[in-house]
Amino acid sequence: GGFVHQVQWGGKSPFETVNGQMPVGFDNYLNVVFGKLNPKGQNLPDFESTNRIGNHLGSVDLGLEIDTYGATLLMYRQSLVEDGSLFYLSNLMDGLNGLKIKRKNSYGADFEINEFLLEFFYSKSQGGDKFIEGDGKARGKDDYFNHVQVRDGWSYYNRTIGIPVISPTTETSWRWP
């Protein structure tokens, strides 16, 4: 198990910034690394002075591996971390669940299956349908992999990094469900 934390920060953006520049500098870097809420960094727009600097996301990973004579079984769960809703347990249903079975013995048949992987990804909860600042029970509308300042979301050349079933907002239409 473990905790994975990634952040996009710095650079330029025309959205919610000061003169198009996103916060930079060592003080802001420390605020990014520690995910400090309401930071007191330099050159902060209103959005980040009441939030966190950068586009944070990650996962809490849990796994259990069972080693038997004939196979190794791996069961795992990755819970999504986006805006604090996991801290308040409001998006517990969202995440990736997996089961992997790997056979240890091969019998030399012309065709045999040595590994089997089954995964189920769910993201419909999003922590609920309301986001109210300061209310731990209303930390919804997670909108995974998207961000106010970084409008193309968690992407590289317009392709989402991480989970391919979630598209950045630049690739979607408001008319679609």
Role assignments for model-derived ranges:
Residues 45-177:
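Outer-membrane beta-barrel pore domains
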